[in-house]
Amino acid sequence: NVEAVRQSLERISWVRHAEVRRRWPSSLELRIEEHEPAAQWGEGAGQLLNTHGEVFTAVMAQPVPLPVLHGPQAVAPDMLGYYREAVDILQPLGRLPRVLTVSPRLAVQLRLDDGMVVELGRQQPKVPVRLRLQRFVEHYPAVLSVAKQRPSVVDMRYPNGFALRVAAAQVHVTESKGKQ
């Protein structure tokens, strides 16, 4: 049964799609498309996102450094698009997004390879996430030149500006024992 063979092949974790054809007189022709992982999906072990934005479960034989995407599975293809745009937009800064999170309310957040978090907010027709990230790239070098510390969080959700949060400085307190 050709259909049973196809279904059996598609149950293999790395197989995205399989085509099976009967060849005369007594052979089968197989065409198999495998998943190409583009990102780790969520926090589940073995959950990956392929290049088509589809979530699948598989074990990687060798660990490969992939970005991590968290969010509602229904928006997985959009998230992959946001990630790809972010890679291109951040290129002038020499930064890469390592984690992209979309909240249940569809707010987008990036964690960059240096640990900085960039809050981008929700996708809006007048000010899409892409434009907010471009504004970050445009103004960040000037901010960095006058800032005493590199910000840990940049909040780009404001229409005409942005907010920075710097990491709290580590303070070492020593107890002095005076006269008693």
What positions do the PLM features span?
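Charged, solvent-exposed interaction patches on well-folded alpha/beta domains
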Residues: 4-11, 17-180
